[in-house]
Amino acid sequence: MKYKDLRDFIAMLEQQGKLKRVAHPVSPHLEMTEIADRVLRAEGPALLFENPVKPDGTRYDYPVLANLFGTPERVAMGMGADSVSKLREIGQTLAYLKEPEPPKGIKDAFSKLPLLKDIWSMAPNVVKNAPCQEIVWEGEDVDLYQLPIQHCWPEDVAPLVTWGLTVTRGPHKKRQNLGIYRQQLIGKNKLVMRWLSHRGGALDYQEFRKLNPDTPYPVAVVLGCDPSTILGAVTPVPDTLSEYQFAGLLRGSRTELVKCIGSDLQVPARAEIVLEGVIHPNETALEGPYGDHTGYYNEQGHFPVFTVERITMRENPIYHSTYTGKPPDEPAVLGVALNEVFVPLLQKQFSEITDFYLPPEGCSYRMAVVSMKKQYAGHAKRVMTGCWSFLRQFMYTKFIIVVDDDVNVRDWKEVIWAVTTRMDPVRDTVLVENTPIDYLDFASPVSGLGGKMGLDATSKWPGETDREWGRVIKKDPAVTVKIDGIWGKLGL
């Protein structure tokens, strides 16, 4: 099923019993988090809070959509896949686009033509009139306090925009960048844009600022759009492909865009709400603290201030929100689903990898378990260093455990068995100092810089050990078949 906008997706989820409307008045201040957290942990439906209420008890004008991607199955649906396992096909497409192989012959070349044709035919379609501009607030009418922005945790400093799809463009780039950055509400037309220096939006901003030190930098933030575009923004799309183009490929139809009223940036035409504005030179503010996906409140830091000059929206718009906290939360669920996209990408680069797993308990990316067909001494160390460096998404992975292909990376019992029986703590541990670490990781010695650990839990080859290696106990297949045949007669 392909969804042209968020409302299409909501309708399908509701039809399948995967979305529930909450008519009872609920406050965005802490209450929505409590409800969404309980529902997500129970693997429950997406939620549409129809009557969000303000602190004074009056009602906000706009409903709040939460827990949209609260199960891997809903993530797969949003990406146009029939099941979570089908996400690997999307990963295979991305792997090909990232590093296309020369055709092996005429037949192979022709077999690739439909995919290439589909990709290049998915250039966005720019329209002049769009639903997202049916209502326009400008100047003094701009008031972010009229939006039901969620205040997620008791010690959060202020309400927080969490699912804002931030649109930027660098001075030398034709394609626009889409990124998800949290934004702290500090005034009726002011948000703090918390983007880390290596993220696409921050890089665009830095390049622009070098060339235009005194010029306001245009930014747009999209709140609520079709699931393909949202998920395209968190998928490792090759630099040669725009997220809008990738969203069209997922959807099977070109992404419709409209030019912002106040800048040349383009936003999804059927978005629910769009914030248009600028970042003024040298205007920053203290951001945080906020409860985050680690399960802790993070440190404060100074980040650019986004001044909202205009808010455009559809008639009766829906405000899309989430919360982040100790796993499981929505980012952790997204990580579980996108894990299936990552596997073919890694296998394209390292064909010896048989599986790859990011345990959600590891905050989506801080720990990875990799299984491989080992071929020589030291091979596991090559794989772990390769994983750290291949995709930007794994730059902050602190721990990588490498196991043989007879170990199920998604079963902690098997992984712990491999670690405790195939590892020597001194010989098989790789420690790397002074590497990039998540800004939110307060366990690192300094902010943004810390260590990494690789655990080689593979069987050791000559050159790695002089000892005779243990043989894994295996059952006699003939006995297993025999017992299978009489099992029902044993009264067990």
Swiss-Prot record:
Topology relative to the membrane:
Peripheral membrane protein
Lineage top rank: taxon = Bacteria
The alphabetized UniProt keywords are: Cell membrane, Decarboxylase, Flavoprotein, FMN, Lyase, Manganese, Membrane, Metal-binding, Ubiquinone biosynthesis
Signal peptide start-end: none
Give the enzyme class.
Answer: lyase
Major localization listed first in the record, in broad terms: membrane
Positions of the catalytic residues: 292
Compartments annotated for it: namely: Cell membrane
What EC number(s) is this enzyme filed under? Answer: 4.1.1.98
* UniProt pathway annotation: Cofactor biosynthesis; ubiquinone biosynthesis
Report residues binding Mn(2+).
177, 243
Q: Which Pfam families match?
A: UbiD, UbiD_C, UbiD_N
Please indicate if the UniProt record lists Metal-binding as a keyword.
yes
How is the co-factor bound, per the entry?
Answer: Binds 1 prenylated FMN per subunit.
Catalytic activity reads: a 4-hydroxy-3-(all-trans-polyprenyl)benzoate + H(+) = a 2-(all-trans-polyprenyl)phenol + CO2
Which cofactor does the UniProt annotation name? prenylated FMN; Mn(2+)
**Annotated residues for binding of prenylated FMN:** 180-182, 194-196, 199-200
UniProt-listed SUPFAM superfamilies: FMN-binding split barrel, UbiD C-terminal domain-like
Assembly, in brief, is: Homohexamer.
Q: Which family does it belong to?
A: Belongs to the UbiD family.
Biological role? Catalyzes the decarboxylation of 3-octaprenyl-4-hydroxy benzoate to 2-octaprenylphenol, an intermediate step in ubiquinone biosynthesis.
- What protein is this chain from? 3-octaprenyl-4-hydroxybenzoate carboxy-lyase
